[in-house]
Structures are given as C-alpha cells and as structure tokens.
Amino acid sequence: MSELPQYKKDFLKSAIDGNILKFGSFLLKSGRTSPYFFNAGDFYRADLLNSISTAYALTIDSLPIQYDIIFGPAYKGIPLATAATIKLGQIRPRAKYAVGRVLVRDRKEAKDHGEGGNIVGAPLKGKRVLIVDDVISRCTAKREPSPRLEKEGGIVAGIVVALDRMEKLPAKDGDDSKPGPSALGELKKEYNLPIYAILTLDDIIEGIKGLVGEEDIKRTEEYREKYKATD
C-alpha cells in the first residue's frame, strides 16, 4: 500500500490523541464487537475541530466532481459541513470556495413558522449539492438527505464522510460468514452517487503503525479480514 498523504496522517494522529479513534472492544448497533470505534462527535475542542475541518477541506479540494453547495444534514453533519466550508475559504481564499460555494443545512423537524420547512440556507433549486457527514455504517443512516434535497430541487453531486469502515452489512439471516456489500456500496448503487471518505479502514490499519500497540493492530486486521465488504 502506498504511503498515506500527510493530511491523512495528521488527521489520524489527532483522532487517536484526542480519543476520537479508540481501540478496545466496542459493541456496535449491528451486534458485532469491533476492536475500534470512531466518534466524530468528539471533535469538540478547537484544535480537534481545526484538524477535522482541514481534513475535510483537503479531501473536498481533491474531488473530481463539480458542486455548488455544501450540505450538512442534522445533526452531526451540520458542524462538520460548517467547519469544512470555512476551512475551504481559508485554504483557497481566491478560488471558487471563497465566492461560489455556500452552506445549507436541514432540520429533522420541519418548522411551521418564520421561514418554515426543513432546509436552512441558500436556495437549492438547480444546484449541485455535496453532502458532508460523519460515518457511513448502515444504509438506512444516510438515505434520508437525498430525497429531501431533491424535493427542494437540488441535485446531489456526491457525499463526503470522515470514515469508510469498508464493512459488509449484517446478513439478514445472521450468517456473517457470507460475502456481502458495504453500506457505502449499497448507497452508491441505490442513488448512483460517488462517495468519498477522509479515511478508510485500510488507511487506519496502515497509519496506526507506531501509534498504537501491536495487539490493537492485529485485532483490527483480523476484524477487517472477517467483515470486509465485497465492493
């Protein structure tokens, strides 16, 4: 595997140092016990927010897609998209981000007074929308924003998340020995959308060498081997 870009190394180290990326034994909603856990909601200090916003901005800056609006879905996506938009303006002050890209967010509960509705920010009609969120772990967790945006006339151009676990969805019959697709792969297929991540599980395993113990690395590699998706 090729060496990780410096911004990925920096992001990974800050996630470990800030206890956002933890190693141990964690029970997931899927019922699986994972040797690692990532919680983007723990990026609450200024230095950590700077780290994640920089990582999002540099990832977005490298994307081969065109977009007009950055969208942060409620709830975790809102601060992430906001921070990424600000950082994009800082790293490219005279480029397209400073003048042409704007931020939109939604509410989980529609407002029936004032401006009303679920969407807050710039008009979406005819605009290409880039969704910024935290983690794709199950298909159902990320399915809601696209229909909402399309209802407002937006065109979803892609999704950027902090982490792609590269993990197959739980089998309906409970037999996890069977090969299967990931949540990210199913979402790509259902909506025909490009989806990008700052880090993948492969990146984590490559990047944590020298940062965590050998036993944690071994357990994470074994978990990847057992649950890695086919897509």
Swiss-Prot record:
Residues the entry annotates as binding orotate: 37-38, 137, 165
Domain of life from the UniProt record: Eukaryota
Catalyzed reactions per annotation: orotidine 5'-phosphate + diphosphate = orotate + 5-phospho-alpha-D-ribose 1-diphosphate
Pathway participation: Pyrimidine metabolism; UMP biosynthesis via de novo pathway; UMP from orotate: step 1/2
Keyword set, alphabetical order: Glycosyltransferase, Pyrimidine biosynthesis, Transferase
GO cellular component, one term: cytoplasm
One GO MF term attached to the UniProt entry: orotate phosphoribosyltransferase activity
Enzyme Commission no: 2.4.2.10
Keyword Transferase: yes
Binding-site residues for 5-phospho-alpha-D-ribose 1-diphosphate, renumbered to this chain: 29, 75-76, 107-108, 111, 113, 133-141
Species of the source: Podospora anserina (Pleurage anserina)
Biological processes, Gene Ontology terms: 'de novo' pyrimidine nucleobase biosynthetic process; 'de novo' UMP biosynthetic process; pyrimidine ribonucleoside biosynthetic process
Family under the similarity heading: Belongs to the purine/pyrimidine phosphoribosyltransferase family. PyrE subfamily.
Subunit annotation: Homodimer.
Name of the protein: Orotate phosphoribosyltransferase
Protein task: Catalyzes the transfer of a ribosyl phosphate group from 5-phosphoribose 1-diphosphate to orotate, leading to the formation of orotidine monophosphate (OMP).
Pfam short name (any one): Pribosyltran
SUPFAM superfamilies reported for this sequence: PRTase-like
